[in-house]
Amino acid sequence: MRLRALLLMVAALLSGAAFVTPAAAQIEVDINAGAVKPLPIAIPVFSGSTRGAEIAQVITGNLERSGLFQPLNVAGVPDKLADVNVQPRFPDWQSTGAQALINGQVTVGADGGLRVDFRLWDVFSQQQLLGLQFSSTPDNWRRVAHKISDAVYERLTGEKGYFDTRVAFVAESGPKLNRIKRLAIMDQDGANPQYLTDGSYIVMTPRFSSTSQELTYMALRPTGSSIYLLNLETSRQETVGKFPGMVFAPRFSPDGSKVAFSVERNGNSDIYVMDLRSRATTRITTDPAIDTSPSFSPDGTKIVFNSDRGGQAQIYVMNTDGSGVRRISYGGGRYTTPVWSPRGDFIAFTKQTGGEFHIGVMRADGGDERLLTTSYLDEGPTWAPNGRVLMFFREGPSGNPRLWTVDITGRILRPAAYSGSASDPAWSPLLD
């Protein structure tokens, strides 16, 4: 199945002959302060096609799950917004308490293709904030809804959206002591889940390439462990080299040309980097300690990892050739699974202290550490492409791990849309 985008944005910021788009919005959402009170927003059914109700529903779900918006029940509003090019009757929408309004229209072509026009309005200033038009094939209507969600999110928060993305994860089933762990993938809102492996062997730690077209992951079989590359467009799968000992925790470099991973031999774990073209492999740590969980910086010049070389697991940063190692975490407890933000400003991690687990973030230099969650077991953070939201998995004493999301303030914590047992999430970049 082709996962490359089939959508085409055919017009951006429509001129809107009858409407005026202001230079600055009257309403905005401060994402960095956290959502104390979500913004009331009206998202009525898009006109023109039965598909319009489904598109509006997906947009509603996306914005509501972000925690920054409060979609309102507007089924009884007299203004039905039949024509996207006609200005809304704002008193009708003001009476709902909405501060923002999204309306849209779906046009179905002779070939079944869709054209979706939408507008974003400031209800009280009665000004248009945004107008876009998208075209897609009939089966990609959800992609249109995600792109509209991203556009609205960016216009009202000033940050890039993250809705037109996918999540790879480990789908778990069976008894706690004999789990079946299959590689799976889904849209970020839980739609279109599919298995990528058959469950005959255990998979762990999937990670996307920067193009979202490839995954790397660890497979554990009775004969040992291996790291695989899986092309999501062709379904071609290959092993990344042969190594003595346990191989685990793979991650792509930002340009996709390399994979960093750990190899454990005789109780010692070190980090290696493989060039995927030449298959040349370089060992970049040689300390007689456990060095693991490598993650590249967005510019590809550094790697963050965790190591117990200081006595217990802490976070370190080094150059990609292994030089310049420096410790950046100094708090009590154990730090594991560090991962660099796509923006380069924060590093997320798992912390174990006082019998509890936390998902936390710190600045890239180790400063401004903050713990965002507390639970029996929270682990495996992965960044949304805007670098302002994290997904992780949470597990209770009885097992049954679930996916959760939290923003970088820690104030917006909620279960992810996927309700099945799942661990080791990996968030893709924005799709093309």
Swiss-Prot record:
It comes from the Bacteria. Residues 1-25 form the signal peptide. It comes from Caulobacter vibrioides (strain ATCC 19089 / CIP 103742 / CB 15) (Caulobacter crescentus). Keywords: Cell cycle, Cell division, Periplasm, Signal. It is found in: Periplasm. The Tol-Pal system is composed of five core proteins: the inner membrane proteins TolA, TolQ and TolR, the periplasmic protein TolB and the outer membrane protein Pal. They form a network linking the inner and outer membranes and the peptidoglycan layer. This is Tol-Pal system protein TolB. One of its GO terms (biological process) is protein import. Part of the Tol-Pal system, which plays a role in outer membrane invagination during cell division and is important for maintaining outer membrane integrity. One of its GO terms (cellular component) is periplasmic space. It holds the Pfam family PD40. Belongs to the TolB family.
